[in-house]
Amino acid sequence: MKFLKNLSASLVFAAGLSLGATNANAGCSAHLGDFDWDSANVHTAIASYVIEKGFGCDVQVSKGSTTPIMAAFFDGQIEVITELWEDNLVELLKPHFADGSILHRGVNTPASEQAFWVDRATAEAHGLKSVEDMKKPGIWELFKDPEDPSKGRMTSCISGWTCYTINYVKLKEYGLDEMYTNFDPGSGGALDAAIAGGFAKGKPVFSYYWTPTSLMGKPEIDMVRLEEPAYDAQCWQDMSVVVEDIKANGTEVYAPSCACEYKDMALTKTVRADWAAANPEVDAFIAAYSIPTETVNNLLAYYVDVSGGDMEATAMWYLENNTEWLDWVPSDVAANIRATL
């Protein structure tokens, strides 16, 4: 399996280092796009292992943030995405689904949520139940940003993730931008560390976050989801237009629109149509691939806390300890996989 660890914005793909011997089928290949968060890593790991070890295909994985990975997917350099936060990318995806160049391949995880969160102790002590409550006098000072002490800090997404720009627009629409910074922690690991560090030190935490994740499953992490205006499809559509404009042209093009809560959603998969036509058996596997949310949480705990971020070890642990994957592949492919475990 070939991994390009740090995908640059220029997306110049070079031959990666093979991480193990493979009996690659010259007529079967897949280039998977992976992202810089744990759940995407886990799904990419399992799919890659099955495609390489089970189907005998040549497999390459490129990892990066949302913007460069999706750009590479749209122009055909990447062929398979195993975890797509589709509702975050409405305007970006629309023309490619419409022209048939990319295809829906169903759900990979049935349930997820994204939101603004506050640690329970602070929320209960100060009656913080909604984003409107974050504007109460003196509240921002509980979360003072050390880099800008005139404001509180809302720890946000990574700037390369679409949700960073969504959160930027939300803070402005909710009138929170005058009180809080939309802080970019720099990496998914740093985002986790900021939240975990706040709990470890007994300090207030105000952050964007999502589930399923290993962090939210830890007993010491107790967060309250802040209420926002209810999800509305038209509102989200209007906001998405502004978000994509900002991503393309910078924050100076911001225009007032609308904001609402993230939609609790199933995470999905997508493939290039030309790749699907050339690799129908592997495409059928991608379409069948789906893991229950509870199992994903267990996988994430193993990936982060046991394997130390080892993608191949996590894939093997999943395949050794679960059986739903047997329904995704023909019996001969399953036998090939079992022979490697």
Q: Where are each of the predicted segments found?
A:
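C-terminal functional modules
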Residues: Y262, W275-A276, D283-L341
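N-terminal segment of the mature folded domain
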Residues: S65-R120
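A bilobed periplasmic-binding-protein/Venus flytrap-type ligand-binding module shared by bacterial periplasmic
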Residues: Q114-E124, A266-A278, A301-Y302
